[in-house]
Amino acid sequence: MNDPEAILRAAEDVIGILKGHRLDAVVIGAVALAAHHYVRQTEDLDLGVNADLPTMRALTVSLRQAGFTAELREPDGDDPLGGVIDVIGPFGLLQIISYANKFPAVIEDALRLSKLVVRKGSPLRIVPIPHLVALKLYAGGYKSKADIVELLARNPGLDLDEIRTVCKQYRLKGLDELLTESSRRQSR
């Protein structure tokens, strides 16, 4: 990340704009992975929300009115997401990713259960590990699976039963093979 302080300030400003639309967000993606002891290179900060398409459109307008460059990528019928707003500025790239009408329960639960913040006094809450694993399983693909393996390997004291329960609750498949791979990594 080019300037972590600048992107955090921008994300905190964006949270204020989200609240004006009665939305809340949870930090997901690489910043959440880093907060949970798995640091990998990233150039952006991702916020997970539950916002329908009309709200995403209105939010894009509000972001522009606040001086941000914001572009909404609307979902098509096959898209696993409910839309993505790219927020661009001197701070870098923020992405507001909606799971509304696709996978809203994981965001709702993460918002309710998140206790970790990016820094003291910040409104930026970090997705809990079980829900981060669920989001990565939902995303699928090699990179997301590799992220899960590394996340689990770097957090050996995790309650794996809780992660299994969360993933089962959302009817996500594929966790067991990743748990096996992670335990192999921890044994090395």
Annotate each language-model stretch with its function:
Residues 1-188:
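Compositionally biased terminal segments of proteins
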